Structure formats: structure tokens, C-alpha cells
Amino acid sequence: MIETNPLIIELPENMKGKDYVIGDLHGCYDELLQLLKFVKFDIEKDRLFCVGDLKDRGPKQNECIALLDKKNKQGQQWFFSVLGNHDYVKNFLSKKLLKDYYTNLLTKLPYIYSVKHPFFKKFFIVHAEMRFFLQNMNNEEITNQLLNNNLSDEIFYSLDNNNIILSESQRKNIIWARDNFQYFVNKNQANITMGDFSFMFKEKNKQIVEKLKIFCGHNVVPFPIVIGHQIYCDTGACFGYNKPRLIEKFAKWGNRFFYLSMIDVNTGQVYGCVTSEKSEIYTEEDYKYNYKRGDVLTMNKTIY
């Protein structure tokens, strides 16, 4: 499937409504509908971008994939997703799927969406990492150059299928790599398995995202946050569905945060829909809220 997926799809500015970004869906269809209802999402005007991983783990992967085929009254697509690593792995397809139909939808997913925006030149959607065009620079150099205004935004804004040629392994890195995330974890000596996310709350993170908006998932975080030069928004929605092997991996974090996150691209406002039967969701100030599955909340802080 990897040979057929386009590398980059460019989309025009949304002149009618808002753009939103949703974290890794993993079949959490009902929670997505709750979020759309909460923000009064209008399919005739608004657009929703997913950072990938529509399927596996959650209860309604079929419904999530089928969103790719939905149109509004004008016949326009309103739901968009990039390719995630779980979307790429064919053998994860459920036996109940009508494989030809769903596989055909997944083979059309791009690795990257490049989207024009009225408030800033563009924003980007990618599943894991977008470092393929900066092969000779490490993450610290990228960060420093972004902060010091030495890295030209044009290197991002000029990307299209005509000037980027990638090998299969490089394409796989876009949906599988964790280098950027792990670099900053190691650099700050953070033990994320013990719930240490203090390294995320540095002021320079917000300075970076003011220059460059790259939304991604793949690495689970307790709330959407800027790490390095990317905005991570996978908040472990699927773990709320009592998958023992997966929940055990994050048990040290406590029963905190399993929810599906959605971001208003215009404002950086974060919304969440709880997937855990019972949970405590922590914001940056460690405010604690007791919620049950299906509850929707507005986070106290924006991410930019």
C-alpha cells in the first residue's frame, strides 16, 4: 500500500468556517461525534483533520474510515486524514471490514497535508515526524534555528510532490519515527513511564509553534503539547477501552487522561472527550477533574 499513497496533498484556505485537528482516532467514533456536537461543527463550513491511525484498538474503526467518503450538501469532503502506521499495516484490518472498500480509502491517504490558513501561511498534518527534508540537522539545531529566526519558513511552505523524492524507508519514517519525541525526552532526562512530563512546559515551546504549526500524533501525551517543533495531540483515546496490555504500559501515569483531543487551529483551544470509564484529566497546572466516558470538556489553556 505504501507505493500508492501520495506524499503531500495541498489544500486551499477555508474561506467559510473553521479548521480543527483531531488526535489518533483508533476507532473512537462515538467520542468524535460528541466533540463535533460540542463545538457545533458544521460540515457545510468547517473542516476536520486527523493525524492518522483511524483504525485498530477502538470499537468502531469501520465508521472512522468511512468518514473519508462523507460529503456535505455541496459534495465537498469535510473530513481529512493523513496515513498513520496502523492504517499502513494491512494485517490489522478487521475480518469484518469490506476490505476492498476500506482499503481503497486508506490507499488514498497522503503522508502529509499542507493547508493554507488565513492567520498564518500554512499548517501541516503528519502522523509521526516531518524531518525528512532536514536530514543533516539534529533536533537541537532545528529548535535553535527556529527560535533564532535562522531557519527559513520557506523550506516548509514550498513543499510539494514535485520537489521532494523519498525512498520507501524515508516514507515509512514519516509514519513510524519517534526521533523528535525521544530526543527531547532524553535531553531533559524525563521518565515518561513514571508520568514525568515537566519538560513539556518550557516557554520556548510556544515560541516555536508561533513560527511553525506541524500537528502530529503517534506518541501519546497527557494533553496536546509542543515538543521540539511539532504539536503532539494523541492523548491515548483508545486506552480508555480497557485494553490491559496497552493500559499497563502507561499505568505509572495513574488513571488520569484517556480521552480524544481536538484542537481549534485558529485559536489553539483544546477540547477533549473522555474514553475511560472513570478518569482524572490533568491540565498543565495539574487541575484534577473526575469524568466518565463520553463527557466533553474544554481545556483551561490553549496550546498557542
Residue ranges, per PLM feature:
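Acidic, histidine-bearing metal-coordination/catalytic regions of metal-dependent phosphoesterases
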Residues: 1-16
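Beta-strand-turn-beta hairpins that frame and shape the catalytic cleft
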Residues: 13-20, 114-124, 227-228
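Core catalytic region of metal-dependent phosphoesterases/phosphodiesterases
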Residues: 18, 22, 27-99
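Active-site metal-binding loops of divalent metal-dependent hydrolases
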Residues: 23-25, 52-55, 85-87, 128-130, ...
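Short catalytic/ligand-binding loop motif for oxyanion handling, primarily in non-cytosolic enzymes
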Residues: 58-59, 88-92, 126, 132-136, ...
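Extended active-site neighborhood of metal-dependent phosphoesterases/phosphodiesterases
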Residues: 91-120
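Active-site-proximal loop/helix segment associated with metal-binding centers of metalloenzymes
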Residues: 117-206, 240
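Acidic, His/Gly-rich catalytic cores of divalent-metal-dependent hydrolytic chemistry
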Residues: 191-304
